[in-house]
């Protein structure tokens, strides 16, 4: 099913992830899901709370951040539809760590950031049996 976002929102995500380089950066995707199609309308950046020496290849947030984001999404009449994060100097392909910490109903936008420049964004969704991710069509529009 397609994942849709506008180009300016994609550029906002790219700028955020370029500023966190060489560490991983990330945030939540807000929007709506209808029959498997996801429309992303807003993002919220989240601080990486993983141990400093591990932030170059790991990303984590606090449970308090998660609860706060659910409240913010509800207040805006939106849903948490997914999560975005970077893979510094690595392909935009989910890692085993990503799979082990992912939720099947979320969309995951992973961006390869190479030498502080975002070069590729791909959309993924974890299978319900949690065995692997499937690539989703990413539609970036005007």
Regions found by a protein language model. Name each.
Residues 1-80, 88-142:
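Conserved beta-strand-loop surface patch within small alpha/beta domains used
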């Amino acid at each position: 099913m397609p994942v849709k976002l506008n180009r300016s929102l994609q550029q906002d995500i790219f700028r955020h992830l370029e500023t966190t380089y060489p560490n991983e950066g990330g945030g939540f995707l807000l929007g709506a899901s209808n029959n498997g199609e996801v429309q992303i309308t807003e993002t919220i950046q989240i601080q990486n709370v993983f141990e400093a020496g591990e932030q170059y290849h790991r990303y984590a947030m606090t449970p308090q951040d998660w609860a706060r984001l659910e409240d913010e999404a509800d207040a805006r009449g939106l849903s948490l539809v997914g999560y975005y994060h970077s893979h510094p100097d690595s392909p935009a392909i989910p890692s085993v760590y990503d799979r082990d910490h992912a939720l099947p109903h979320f969309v995951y936008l992973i961006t390869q950031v190479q030498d502080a420049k975002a070069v590729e964004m791909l959309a993924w969704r974890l299978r319900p049996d949690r065995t692997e991710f499937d690539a989703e069509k990413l539609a970036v529009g005007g």
